[in-house]
Amino acid sequence: MFKHSTGILSRTVSARSPTLVLRTFTTKAPKIYTFDQVRNLVEHPNDKKLLVDVREPKEVKDYKMPTTINIPVNSAPGALGLPEKEFHKVFQFAKPPHDKELIFLCAKGVRAKTAEELARSYGYENTGIYPGSITEWLAKGGADVKPKK
């Protein structure tokens, strides 16, 4: 199979000749979040949106962004596909419900995009990405941002 910008381009070989079939699909693009939008979510947590840090636990130990949950994409890529009880057993918190918007971040934005794509494959349709991630967050003074009561 060959990946194509508008869908999946697959090749079917028959006795006569190869045939190319273009299958298209549409999905809602993830929302892209800026530093200011994420800062607002940290300062004013929203029960309809959830910040998901997909870095590895050892990275999160160095700096944990306020109000985030940690679901590491490299060591647990299938986490969002787990049954709720198993997810809770592994992560010690409830599996995010499908009706929440999951906003993914990592160190520099690359793993966040991967995690967002995986989340979609597990039925999470309302997703976002903070491409600046922790690198931008810290560079712009995010370490001083705290939830307001």
Swiss-Prot record:
The Rhodanese domain covers 45-146
Output the CDD domains linked to this UniProt entry: RHOD_HSP67B2 (cd01519)
Q: Please list the residues that make up the transit peptide in this record.
A: 1-25
Role, per record:
Thiosulfate sulfurtransferase which catalyzes the transfer of sulfane sulfur from thiosulfate to cyanide.
Q: Say what happens when this gene is deleted.
A: Increases frequency of mitochondrial genome loss.
Task: State any further remark.
Answer: Present with 4220 molecules/cell in log phase SD medium.
Please name the GO terms that the record assigns under molecular function.
thiosulfate-cyanide sulfurtransferase activity
Tell me the protein's name: Thiosulfate sulfurtransferase RDL2, mitochondrial
